[in-house]
Amino acid sequence: MELQIISGDLEGAVKVSKQIPEFESTYALNEYESRLDESALILTAENCEEPVGFKVGYDRFKDGSFYSWMGGVLPDYRQSGVASALADVQEEWAKEKGFTSIKLKTRNKHEAMIAFAIDRGFDITEPEPNKDIREMRIWMEKKL
């Protein structure tokens, strides 16, 4: 695999997001554009110039934390270091920009995402109760 992490390719990130099977409904390009501002970081992982993963975040809370809003890796490229490479770049960038932590939100049913985050040093900070326990949202944070 010839993995390359590039910054700023929002269309590539949205293209990958639409192919992530865990995302039951995906955001259109205009939703990304309306949420993101100058604080945003858009990363796309490419293999042979084809997008295979992405990570998008921004300064949502204005409290020193960077919000890792959306991200994913195509199933055929999982367990190959793509998610770690994206997270490494995001964390280094956030530190350089002066952020003191990274926050993310996932769902209880995404066990692989929860395990990945815990392995990278994230703590569970707050559950958001839901009638369907599998749909419960879970906030996580990593101090940088």
Question: Model-flagged regions — what are they?
Answer:
Residues 40-44, 54, 70, 103, ...:
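Short hydrophobic/aromatic beta-strand element in the GNAT-like acyltransferase core
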